[in-house]
């Protein structure tokens, strides 16, 4: 899967909006993930006790983790597909330590698309959504290949 220069530009344009409030976007993404797929919450010992959206919104730890997740993703997206160095340690930790299935990366990708659309409807039209979907699919495909190298069937 290859994105054109124009598609990468669409991805990076919307990502610039994310970077104005990485922690807030990250928190929204995780809340969307956990509400839509409560089973994903079980992978996070630190957040298992958060049962309501209000509890999630009040959690500084959740906000910090959202910041960590989207900061890492932003670093990967900015590499425009040349993300081997960034992906390797991420795949290692997610496969061997956290045991995060690829399906969960699909879930969080959907949450990212939803949050971007809800926060930036005027800047995240069909073209930008399509480009971001392709970029996230490329990320998932490449991390799945790393998982396979590590012997994780996630």
Swiss-Prot record:
GO CC term, one of those recorded: sarcoplasm
Residues that coordinate or bind heme b: 94
Localization of this protein: Cytoplasm, Sarcoplasm
GO function term, MF aspect, one: peroxidase activity
Pfam families: Globin (PF00042)
Record has Transcription regulation as a keyword: no
GO biological process: removal of superoxide radicals
InterPro entries in UniProt: Globin (IPR000971), Globin-like_sf (IPR009050), Myoglobin (IPR002335)
Record keyword Transport present: yes
Residue sites binding O2 per the record: 65
Enzyme Commission code: 1.7.-.-, 1.11.1.-
Domain Globin: 2-148
SUPFAM superfamilies in alphabetical order: Globin-like
Family that this chain belongs to: Belongs to the globin family.
Assembly description: Monomeric.
This protein's name: Myoglobin
Originating species: Balaena mysticetus (Bowhead whale)
Species lineage: Eukaryota, Metazoa, Chordata, Craniata, Vertebrata
Gene that encodes it: MB
